[in-house]
Amino acid sequence: MNAELRLRLSVGLLSAAVIGYEIGLTRLFSFLQHYHYTFLVVSGAVCGLGLGAALSAAIRQGTEGLGRHLGWWAAFCASSMGLGALLLATFPRMPLLLMVAVAGVPFIAAGAFLALVFRVRHTESQRLYCWDLVGAALGILWIVVALEWLGGVAALISAGMLALAASVLLAERLLARLTMLGLLVVLVVALLVARDGAIDLRALAEAADKPMFRALGSGPDGRSTGEVVDTRWSAFARTDLVDRSGDTGLNLYVDGGAGSYMFRFPGDYRRLFFLRREAAFFPYYFGKRERALIIGPGGGADVLYALMTGWRDIEAVEINPEIVDLVRERGDYNGHLYDLQGVDVHTGDGRNYLQRSDRRYDLIALPLVYAEAADLVGYALAENYLFTRE
C-alpha cells in the first residue's frame, strides 16, 4: 500500500472515530448528567478541534518532519479515547469541568492531526476532505451499531481502536508499529472489561440526583434498595430494568430518569385491584371505552388500566424500542401484556403516528410525557411543543 493511500485511509478512520466518539459521549453524558448537558459535548468537540488546530500551528518543521508527527497524534487520540472512557465510567461523579476536560482531550489530538494533514498535503486538500467526509458518514453508521452491541463505554473504546488503526497505517518504523500494536492490545482488553458494564453505579447511587440513582441508593439498614436486572444501550438512550422489591413489579428507567412501572401480572385482574386507587386510573372510567390511544406506555401500567376498565381496542405508541423489547421478553412476568388480544403496540413517535393515522379515539393518554417533571423544576416555564401542531 503506497503512502498516499495510507494517509487517505488514516484520515477516514480518524474522522469515523471522532464523530463516533462524539455521538457516544452524548449518550454517556445523558446518563451520567441530565439530558441538557449533552449539548455541551458538541460545543466541547468544536472547541477541542479548534484548540488542536491552533496547537499544530506552533509546530515549526518542514513537510517531512511534520509527516512523522501524524502517527503519534493519531495514537495519542486513540489512547485518550480509551483512557477517557474508562475514567468517566470509573469516576462518574467527578466535577463537571473535569469531566468535560477528560472527554475533550481526544478532540484536541484529532484537531492537531487533521490540521497537520492538510498542512502537509495542502495540494490534495479536496481528496483528503472527501475521505474526511466519507469516514465521518461511515462513523455515524458504525456508532449506532456499536452502542447497541457493545454499550456506551465500550463503544467509546472501540472508537479509540479505529483511531489507533489510523496511527498504525502511518507508522513508518517497526518499533513505532509494535508500540501501537501493543496499545491496540490494551484497548481490546479495556473493551472486553467495559463490555460487561464499567460504570460505577454505587457512586451514582450516592449522588441520588436522578430517579434511577435514588432507586439504587441504600436503605436505613445500609443495603441497596434496588438492583439492575437488565441494561440496554442504543443510539436513543440507555434503558435499565431495576428490581426494587420484586413483589408487585419492576421499574424501567431511560437514561436514569423517565421511570415507568412493569407490574407483575399473572393474568388475574383481581390481583391488581389495588391499582384502582391510582390517580392515573381515573381517566379510564370515562368515555365509550371503545378505542384508546396511549402515547408512551413504558412498562405497560396504562395498558393495564385500560384493560381493567374494559376498553375494547387499545393502541400504544412507544418511542423507545428497547422498552418494548424488555416488556415482551419478560412476558411470563407481566402476563404478555403487549401481546394480549385487543392490545396493539407500535414503536415510533406519538405525534407522527397520529399524523399518519386517520382513526378517531375516545381517549388519548400521555402517561410518560411529564415523567421527569419533578426533576426538571427549573424548566417549569419553558416552552413545550408536545401538544402543538408543529
Language-model features, listed with the residues they occupy:
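Alpha-helical transmembrane segments of multi-pass membrane proteins
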Residues: 1-390
